[in-house]
Regions:
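Short coil/turn segments at secondary-structure boundaries
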Residues: 56-63, 82, 110-114, 151
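Internal helix-loop-helix
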Residues: 72-142
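Extended, charge-enriched "interface" segments that sit outside catalytic cores
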Residues: 1-53, 60, 65
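A generic alpha-helix structural signal
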Residues: 40, 67, 98, 132-136, ...
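Conserved active-site and cofactor/substrate-binding residues in soluble primary-metabolism enzymes
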Residues: 38, 61, 65, 92, ...
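N-terminal cofactor/phosphate-binding cores enriched in small/glycine residues
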Residues: 36-56, 66-82, 92, 96
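Glycine-rich, Trp-frequent "lid" loop and neighboring beta-strands that shape
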Residues: 86-87, 130-176
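A short beta-turn/loop motif at secondary-structure boundaries
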Residues: 61, 68-69, 154-156
Length: 176
């Protein structure tokens, strides 16, 4: 079999990544591509001015102000519809923007990515309109940070057997 006729999965199995079959990503619609280019430029400028990965690693903490700043850029609501304070971008645009952010700091990328992918994705896909109206605007602006709690002592990481419940504190300000 000729090398150029070898399938992607087969070549991947043998440790050969056929970049010609992966890159570039499929083309974006022109107006989305323009938005992505502007977002990537803004991410680069933001990163150059504000990201200090070494300090964050030394402090074992990322300042909340950083999350506030990426929220101001719109990065916390890339997939949320505009009517809910998001940018309403397609997944491909999300991928391009995250590719840029990941070149600067993986911890920030995971924070922003988890918020949208495993954090509020179920709300986007399965939430009713009342739930979307209640939560998405604040999730898209970073006022709320979405989370997904999976591992617990009695079930490990088996999501089907989780028994933990969130209980509102007596002062009504947070859940435990």
């Amino acid at each position: 079999m000729k090398e150029d006729a070898e399938g992607f999965i087969k070549s991947l199995f043998f440790g050969n990544i056929r970049e010609d079959m992966v890159f570039p990503f499929p083309r974006l619609e022109p107006e989305v591509a323009e938005t992505v280019a502007m977002m990537q430029e803004a991410v680069g400028k933001f990163a150059d001015e504000h990201i200090d990965s070494t300090k964050w690693d030394e402090d074992a903490a990322m300042p909340r102000e950083i999350v506030d700043k990426v929220s101001e850029l719109g990065l916390m609501g890339l997939l949320v519809e505009e009517r809910h304070n998001g940018l309403g971008l397609p997944m491909m645009a999300y991928g391009h923007i995250f590719e840029k952010l990941a070149t600067y700091d993986s911890a920030l990328t995971v924070t922003v990515g988890a918020h949208q992918s495993i954090g509020y994705k179920a709300l986007l896909l399965y939430g009713n309109e009342e739930q979307r109206e209640r939560f998405l605007p604040r999730l898209a602006t970073g006022e709320l940070i979405a989370a997904f709690c999976l591992t617990e002592p009695s079930s490990g990481s088996d999501a089907a057997s989780i028994q933990t419940k969130a209980v509102l504190s007596e002062d009504g300000k947070h859940y435990t």
